[in-house]
A protein has these predicted regions:
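Disulfide-stabilized, aromatic/cysteine-rich ligand-recognition loop
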Residues: 133
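His-enriched metal-coordination microenvironments in redox/metal-binding proteins
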Residues: 1-127, 136-137
Length: 137
């Protein structure tokens, strides 16, 4: 659970050969949940760091819980699976498995958090109106 208001800067899934999907989800203090990022075609030999654009970096209030969920494919249909007949547990070797997400965060003061939320709300309102201030159709 986040102790302070937070801006999520990036998300880098890390799994090994059987890794398939990884998702990071926020559970807000009011109970609402939201998927922040989901990588559906994880490639174990191409670990990508997904850096959020400034206007899209998730802003999370204090008390938010982050949940990382990972899916692995240990079937014979997975071309990256060295041996689908083997039970696989956690381990550091590439032929073992693991799942964790590397993320960077910036902790914000409550005032900075509220100001950034207000700035983004103003940007959204401006984008939803046309050049003359009338709504786009």
């Amino acid at each position: 659970q986040l102790r302070w208001p937070t801006r999520l800067e990036n998300f880098q899934p890390h799994m090994h050969m059987r890794g398939k999907i990884m998702m990071i989800e926020a559970i807000y203090p009011n109970g609402r949940s939201e998927v922040l990022s989901r990588v559906d075609n994880f490639q174990w030999n191409w670990h990508v760091n997904y850096i959020y654009a400034d206007h899209a970096a998730p802003l999370l209030p204090a008390g938010t819980t982050l949940i990382v969920t990972a899916w692995h494919d240990n079937t014979k249909d997975n071309p990256n699976n060295p041996d689908y007949t083997q039970w696989i547990g956690w381990g550091d070797r590439t032929v073992d498995e693991m799942a964790h997400a590397w993320i960077d965060v910036t902790y914000l003061s409550e005032e900075d958090y509220e100001a950034e939320v207000a700035r983004r709300d103003a940007m959204k309102a401006q984008q939803s109106s046309g050049p003359s201030g009338s709504p786009n159709h």
